[in-house]
Amino acid sequence: MAQVINTNSLSLITQNNINKNQSALSSSIERLSSGLRINSAKDDAAGQAIANRFTSNIKGLTQAARNANDGISVAQTTEGALSEINNNLQRIRELTVQASTGTNSDSDLDSIQDEIKSRLDEIDRVSGQTQFNGVNVLAKDGSMKIQVGANDGQTITIDLKKIDSDTLGLNGFNVNGGGAVANTAASKADLVAANATVVGNKYTVSAGYDAAKASDLLAGVSDGDTVQATINNGFGTAASATNYKYDSASKSYSFDTTTASAADVQKYLTPGVGDTAKGTITIDGSAQDVQISSDGKITASNGDKLYIDTTGRLTKNGSGASLTEASLSTLAANNTKATTIDIGGTSISFTGNSTTPDTITYSVTGAKVDQAAFDKAVSTSGNNVDFTTAGYSVNGTTGAVTKGVDSVYVDNNEALTTSDTVDFYLQDDGSVTNGSGKAVYKDADGKLTTDAETKAATTADPLKALDEAISSIDKFRSSLGAVQNRLDSAVTNLNNTTTNLSEAQSRIQDADYATEVSNMSKAQIIQQAGNSVLAKANQVPQQVLSLLQG
C-alpha cells in the first residue's frame, strides 16, 4: 500500500461506515419514537400501501358499525311508535265490541264513537310526529338504506311504511252511523296513484263510472210523471215510443185506458219478421186459438185463414163478400165487442168504436218496464225522462246504455255522462282542482271528489277491519324486529372484522420494540467504535513524516 498524504483512504472508509451506522441508528430511534416500523414509503413501499388500505377498511368498518347502531335506533324508535299505535287499536277494538251489543243507547254509542275518534286522531298524530334525527319514520312509505360496510353496495334496507287511520283502512271508522268524515285534500301523489295521464298540469283520470242502465234513466221519475219508452213486446221486436205513467204506490209503469189508433195495437203483439206468435183471442167470452204473423195477419192455429164477419166475430168461411181477412188492426177497428188478446204473456183488452172505426180504447198488461227500474225510482218531482230508441239504446246482453257511438255512464253524483274520464289540475301550491276550479279531495275509499266531507256510515264488519289493521301493524313490527336482529349481527361482525384487520395492520406497520431497541443499541456501540477508529485512521498520514525526518 502506497504511503500518501493527500488521500486518507482509511479515514474515508471509516467515515462512510459511520454514516451508514448513523442512518441505521436514526431509523431505529424514529421507529422507537413513533411506534411504527413504516414511517414513510422508503421504509417499506409495499407494506406502506397494504397498511394504508387496511387503514381505509378499518376506518370504514368502524363508521359502518356506528351506522348500523343508528339503524337499530331507527328501528327501535319506529317499533316503539307502532307499539303505541297497537295499544290504541286494541282499545278501539274493545270499544267496538262494546258498541256491537244491542243494549247501548244512542247516547252510549255517541260516547263510544267520540273515544274511537280520539284514538284514531292519536294514531294520526303519532304517525305524523314520530321522527328520528328529523326524519319522519311513519309519515310516508319509503326505505332507508343503512351503510354497513366499507365499500359500495354494502347496505341493509329498513322498509318504512305510512301508518295512519287511512292506510290502516280505518278512515271514517264508525260504530253509530252518525256525523260526517272529513275528506283529505288531494295531492299530486293521489293523481299519480290514480294512473293519470299528464299533459302539463292537467291530469286525466279514468273515473271508473258504472255503465248506465235503463233504471238509471228512470231514476228521476216521481208519481204521475210519464216516461216515453220503447218496450219490447216479448218477441224481440221493439215497438215505437210510447208514454208510460209511473205509479209510486205500486212502483210500476203502465199504459192503461189509452185511446189510440187501431194500428198501434200491433206494436204490442206482432212478432219479429219470419216468426209466428201463438195465442188466444177471446170475443164476448168465445175463445179462439190463433197464430199471428209478423205483418199482423191472424190465422187459425192450424194455419187456416180467419175472417171477421159482420158481427165482429172470427170465422173460417171466407166466401162472403162482406168478410174481412182477420188481422190485429182490422179486428180492433171493426169490432165493437169486448175483446182480449193474450200472446207471450202480454194481454190487451180493447173495445172498438163503431162511430170512429180507426180508434179504439184499450189497456195493456204484461208489457211493463223492467223490474230493475223500480228499485232506483226516486221522488224527484217534475222530471220527465225521454227514453226512446232515438235517444238511448239498451244492450240486450249487458243492459248497458249507449247514446249513438258513445257509451253512457253514471257519475259519482248519479248524473248521466258520455265521458268516463275526469280532468284535474295541479296548482303551483300543490293543491288539486277540477275543471271548474273547485278544490278536490280524497275520500275514505280513495276516490277523488269535490266534497270536503263524506256522510258517515256505520262501518261494515268493524271487528274484521280492526283485526286486519292490527295484523298489518304486527307484520310491520315483525319486519322491524327482524331488521334489528340483522343489524345487531352486522355490528358484531363489523367489530370482529375491524379487530382482525387492526391486528393484520399492526403486524405490517407497527414497530417491534425488542428488535428496534437491539438495533439501536447495536448502532450506538458501532457508532462509538467508529468514532474511535476514525481518530486512529486520521493519524495514519502522520507516519509519512517519519520518513521525511529520517
From Swiss-Prot:
The compartments listed are:
Secreted; Bacterial flagellum
Carries keyword Ribonucleoprotein? no
Extract one GO cellular component term from the record: bacterial-type flagellum
Q: Which Gene3D superfamilies match?
A: 6.10.280.190, f41 fragment of flagellin, C-terminal domain, f41 fragment of flagellin, middle domain, f41 fragment of flagellin, N-terminal domain, Flagellar export chaperone, C-terminal domain
Chief subcellular location equals secreted
Molecular-function GO terms, alphabetical: structural molecule activity
Question: What are the alphabetically sorted keywords of the record?
Answer: Bacterial flagellum, Secreted
Q: Which NCBIfam families match?
A: PRK08026.1
What role does this protein play?
A: Flagellin is the subunit protein which polymerizes to form the filaments of bacterial flagella.
Family stated for the protein in its record: Belongs to the bacterial flagellin family.
Recorded protein name is: Flagellin
**What organism is the protein native to?**
Shigella flexneri
Identify the taxonomic lineage of the organism of origin. Bacteria, Pseudomonadati, Pseudomonadota, Gammaproteobacteria, Enterobacterales
Record gene name: fliC
